[in-house]
UniProtKB/Swiss-Prot annotation:
Gene Ontology cellular component terms for the protein in this record: membrane
Uppermost EC category: hydrolase
SUPFAM superfamilies found in the cross-reference section: Glycoside hydrolase/deacetylase
Gene this chain is encoded by: arnD
Keywords from the UniProt entry: Antibiotic resistance, Hydrolase, Lipid A biosynthesis, Lipid biosynthesis, Lipid metabolism, Lipopolysaccharide biosynthesis
Protein name: Probable 4-deoxy-4-formamido-L-arabinose-phosphoundecaprenol deformylase ArnD
Length: 297
């Protein structure tokens, strides 16, 4: 049996309202627990539209047929009107996710704000954004928040340092190959990172694979993964237009003896056995701009 961490990012108002219930239903059907990471502040995702001026982002939107994949309400959210606050409206749904046995962590306060501004925010602004999200999610959940995964994998050494004061069980802030302990600037070791190892739907569709090829492509990649496989889906995609495709993935995975689990299940009993590394900014296939990427020490 191959075990794979299943991470579900919830970025938007509609992804929370429509995508999460749909995913909860299909996961219950297959008796799967996963790790959900919620954005809990304003939905300003439509403000990414200015990035269409960048050829790499424009090509990503075109090859993934973004208008059909996400819907115009997501693509325009927070542009002509103030972004609606996700956690304030859907707290009961977030609690329902927790009560269904899934792991729930923080994705962001303002998903667009983090992706667009994290590189230029001051240390105080960075900490304030994370604190606001943690405070909002803490008020929603019946138990303390124990994990987080920053928006768009926009993380570096400064983000790692900022999160230390929260003493979380783990973070999932970067792309890489296996869980590791990040080296801190004082020479110590930080909170365990569990990187995402596999490509997401929007990173490869229309360029490397078609819809009809996608599930076999991902399952083959899981079986060939020589690290600790972690797969990310999005409530807006696999909980929306690609729900049937995702359900078929779960069915095929069962046939191939691939088992999905929450990311915390991938943590070793003794974190001192993990390798040491760092998170550095780097370009990444299928993405515009930089992402946090695991590097060896």
């Amino acid at each position: 049996m191959t075990r794979v961490g299943l991470r579900i990012d919830v970025d938007t108002w509609r992804g929370t309202r429509d995508g999460v219930p749909a995913l909860l239903k299909v996961l219950a059907e297959f008796d799967i627990q996963a790790s959900f990471f919620f954005s809990v502040g304003p939905d300003n995702m439509g403000r990414h539209l200015w990035r269409l001026l960048r050829p790499r982002f424009l090509w990503k939107m075109l090859r993934s047929n973004a208008a059909s994949l996400y819907g115009w309400d997501i693509l325009l959210a927070g542009t002509a009107w103030p972004g609606r606050h996700i956690g304030a409206r859907f707290g009961s749904l977030i609690r329902q996710t927790h009560d269904a046995g899934h792991e729930v962590g923080l994705h962001s306060w303002d998903h667009h704000g983090w992706q667009a501004n994290v590189a230029r925010w001051s240390d105080a602004q960075l900490a304030a954004q994370f604190h606001e999200g943690m405070d909002a999610l803490t008020q929603i959940l019946p138990s303390p928040v124990r994990c987080s995964a920053v928006a768009g994998w926009r993380a570096d050494a400064r983000v790692v340092e900022m999160k230390q004061r929260w003493n979380l069980d783990y973070n999932s802030d970067c792309r890489g190959t296996q869980p590791f302990r990040p080296r801190l600037k004082n020479g110590g070791l930080g909170t365990t990172q569990i990187p995402v190892t596999l490509p997401t739907y929007d990173e490869v569709i229309g360029e490397r694979v078609s819809d009809g090829e996608f599930n076999d492509f991902i399952l083959d990649a899981i079986e060939q993964d020589r690290g600790v496989p972690v797969y990310t889906i999005h409530a807006e995609v696999e909980g929306g237009a690609k729900l049937a495709l995702f359900r078929q993935l779960l069915l095929l995975a069962r046939q191939r003896h691939i088992e999905f689990c929450p990311l915390s299940s991938l943590l070793p009993d003794d974190s001192t056995t993990l390798p040491v590394g760092r998170i550095e900014r780097a370009p990444f296939p299928g993405r515009e701009g930089w992402l946090g990427v695991q590097t060896e020490e």
